C-alpha cells in the first residue's frame, strides 16, 4: 500500500499519515506543515507501555497472532481451510495455540505519522524478510503488531517518538461510553485543542457533528 501510493512516488513528500474515516484534522494545514518543518526527520507512533506489553504478551497479543482468524480476503476460496475451519475454531475456543510464538512482540496504535526514512526502512525490511509478512496471514488486528514489532528496537535511531502518535484518542473517558475509544463530541473540543494532536478520533456523523463544525471553523481562522 505504501509503496504503491502516489505520495511515495513523489520524492518531494516527506511525511505519510495513516488515518481512517473516523479521523478528523484538528489543526490547520499551515499548522501541520509548520510542525513537521520544525520537527523534520521525526516520526510519531504510540507503543503500548512496558507494563502493558508484559501483561498483554500472556494472552492479548497471542490471541491475535497464534490463533487462526479467517478474515483475509480470498481465504474462503481455499477448500482445505473450509474443511478444517470448524475443527480449528472449536480447538481455539479454549485458547489452545496452534501457531508458533513470535519472540519480542510489541504492539500499539495503528495510526501513525512517519517520515519518509521510516517508510523506506519498513519497506526494505519487508523486502528482506517476506516470511515475516507472510506469517501475519490469518491473524487479527495485526496492523497493531506488525510495524511495532519491526520498529521497536530501532525506534531511537529512526527518530520515532514511541509515546506520541499526534492523535487525540480517549481510551479512558470520564463519561459513559458505548464503545472504546470514546466517540468524541463538542465536550472534547477544549482538550483536543490543548493537545498537540493533528488528528482526533473517533468521530461519527450525528454524534460528532457540532464538534466537527467547531474544528472546521477554528482551522479556517488559523
Give residue spans per PLM region.
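ER/Golgi luminal nucleotide-sugar-dependent glycosyltransferases, focusing on the catalytic module
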Residues: 1-222
